[in-house]
Structure formats: C-alpha cells, structure tokens
Design a protein with these regions (language model features):
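Glycine-rich segments within core transmembrane alpha-helices of 12-TM secondary carriers
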Residues: 33-65, 74-80, 270-284
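Interfacial helix-cap and linker-helix signal at transmembrane-aqueous boundaries
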Residues: 53-64, 168-169, 200-202, 287-295
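Intracellular terminal tails of multi-pass secondary transporters
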Residues: 88-123, 266, 272, 295-344
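Intracellular juxtamembrane helix-capping segments at the cytosolic ends
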Residues: 14-27, 247-262
Length: 344
C-alpha cells in the first residue's frame, strides 16, 4: 500500500505545475488570477463532494465483502482513470501549436492567441532548452520568494483539509458522521471568495493587496478557531480560514505568473513552487496534534505565524517591484522586456 501511495504521488506530481504553466502561457497577465480561481474552484467542488461520497461509500462497510475504504479506491480510481484517458484528447497545446489540439482553434484563431501573448510579454516561443538555461533561471531571487510563500501557504491548507474532520470531532464535539459533512461545507463556500477576490485582483491589476487581505482573514479565522469559546464562532473561523487560504492559492499563482516571463523561467518557477507546496504539505501534516484538542495551539500559532511571514515577503516584493518599475520608466534599467512592468 505504501508503494502504491508513492506511485500515486509520483504520477500526480506533474499535474499542478503543468496546469499552472499551461494557464500562464495562454492568458495575459491581467487575466491569469481569475483563471487560476476557476481551476481552484473545480478542485474545491471535487474535494468537498468527494468527502461526502466517501462518507456514503464507507457506510457499505457492513454489507459487502469489500471494506468501505476499498470502495473509495475503486470508485475514485475508476473516475480518475476515465477522466485521464479523455484528457489526452481534451487537453490543449500551447498557443503557438493550438491548431494541433482536438477541434480547438483554427490557424487564424491561433495567430490571434499568439499575438495577444506577444503583445503582453513577448514570450510565446521558448528559447532552446539546455541544462545551463534551466540552471540560469535559479539566479532569480523571485523564484525562491514565490516558492517559500507556497511552502508557508500549504502548511495551513494541508492541516485544514486533512484534519478538519478531526478538529470538528475532537475539538468541537461533533459526531464522526456530522464532522465529515460539516467539513465539506466550508469548501463549497470557499468558491465564492476565491472567485470574487481573483476578479478584483485582475480587474484592478493588483496582486499584493489581495494576498495581504486574505492573510488577515486567515489570521482572524485561526484566531477564532483557536481562542473563541463558542462552537459556532469557532466554526465561522473555519469558514474564514478556508476561504482565505483557498483564495490565496489563486492569488499567489497570479502573483508569480504576472511577474515571471520566459517559457523556461515559467516552467522552473511552476516546478519549484509545486515542490515547496508539497514540502509545506508534509510539514503541515505534523502541526495538528491530537493531544492539543480542543484548541490546537501549535497549529494555530504556526498558521498565524506563516501568514505574517507571507505578508512580510509580499511587502518586500512590492517595494522591489515598485522601485524596479520606476527605474525602468526613467530608462535606468531594463526588466524582463522593454515594455514589461511588474505587477504588485
């Protein structure tokens, strides 16, 4: 079983960097965050619905030769396999090769798509791939800053998504069945803040303020979850925290994609942030300690502290981006391109 879990992780590892790279390749910088929000919303709906479906499948435990958890693997594995097969034809190519995709764009429409991206950042066609070209991308400090923010972000997301039923059951006194159902509701709710905040970010061309606002919402949510006395107030805190970290997933993706140009730098950044996102997930699985119920002080403190750090990094990046844009405007330096400006 451990070996199968390792295989599952290996095959899943390329999904998010691949999707992030494709989205950032197809859309202009002022359009990206809202598209990342749609991607995240789809995951949320599947995650929440999957929890409810798993709850139902687990009830079969006493009425069949197979265990409930075995039905979970069979049903979800079958659905994932079918979708994966369909995706081979459904997934589109990069803009310059879009006419090759299955019934997607004709040659004229492909040229329009390419022209949009060239006008925005002039990086449709990649340079020749080489090891030195890949390693050169790691000289950019932004890659490390964005990666570290994703690490800090996923400390919270893993703790909440995997341990929310435990928090509801042990920390708030709900039954096991009620905890499973109640754990799904915040994820359905989170679709609203991620879409709204992302639309605002794209509409007004801002990234940092949206991230900081979401961080404050998460800090308030975890404060309620960790220190409020009433169960209702603590559950409201779960909603605030879940909506905030989900919104920041799209916001951080929009932030890095808006300030990175070049196909290989995008690919390297997407891979780096995904790797650090995974490391954050590993670390996040240790911060919810059962013996700290019902307050979970370690998880509360680390979650709040991690988002204070995100605010600090965003502030530093914003100052750097502002100064760099100002230097380019005065003709004192050249950024990623002649007409490129950082988005903050």
């Amino acid at each position: 079983m451990v070996f199968m879990r390792v295989l599952l992780g290996i095959f899943m590892s390329g999904i998010y960097p691949g999707l992030a790279l494709v989205i950032s390749s197809w859309y202009r910088r002022e359009e990206m965050q809202f598209r990342f929000a749609f991607l995240q919303s789809g995951e949320l709906i599947v995650l929440a619905t999957g929890g409810i479906v798993n709850f139902g499948l687990n009830q079969i435990d006493d009425h069949s030769r197979l265990k409930g958890w075995q039905y979970m693997y069979l049903v979800q594995g079958l659905v994932a396999s079918l979708v994966g097969i369909l995706t081979y034809w459904w997934m589109v190519d990069f803009p310059e090769n879009a006419q090759r995709s299955f019934h997607f764009l004709n040659e004229e429409e492909t040229n329009i798509a390419v022209a949009r991206i060239e006008d925005d950042r002039n990086d449709v066609l990649p340079t020749e791939l080489s090891l030195s070209e890949v390693l050169r991308q790691f000289r950019d400090v932004k890659v490390y800053g964005f990666s570290f923010m994703f690490f800090l972000q996923n400390l919270v997301s893993t703790a909440l998504s995997y341990f929310l039923p435990i928090i509801l059951q042990s920390g708030m006194g709900f039954s096991q069945n009620k905890s499973i159902i109640l754990a799904a509701i915040p994820y359905y709710y989170a679709v609203l803040p991620v879409l709204i905040s992302s639309r605002v970010g794209d509409r007004y061309g801002i990234r940092g303020p949206v991230i900081v606002f979401n961080c404050f919402c998460l800090i308030a949510g975890f404060g309620m979850l960790g220190f409020a006395e009433q169960v209702t107030a603590r559950y409201v805190g779960v909603f605030l925290a879940t909506g905030a970290y989900v919104s920041n997933w799209a916001a951080l993706n929009g932030y890095q994609a808006s300030n990175i140009t070049g196909q290989w730098k995008r690919a390297v950044t997407a891979a780096s942030v995904t790797a650090c996102n995974g490391l954050g997930g590993v670390a996040g699985s240790f911060i919810v300690k059962q013996n700290e119920a019902p307050r979970y002080h370690t998880a509360t403190a680390i979650s709040i502290g991690s988002h204070i750090l995100i605010i600090a990094i965003v502030a530093l990046f914003s100052c750097f981006f502002f100064a760099a844009n100002r230097r380019q405007k005065r003709g004192k330096s050249l950024l990623e391109g002649k007409d490129f400006r950082y988005t903050y």
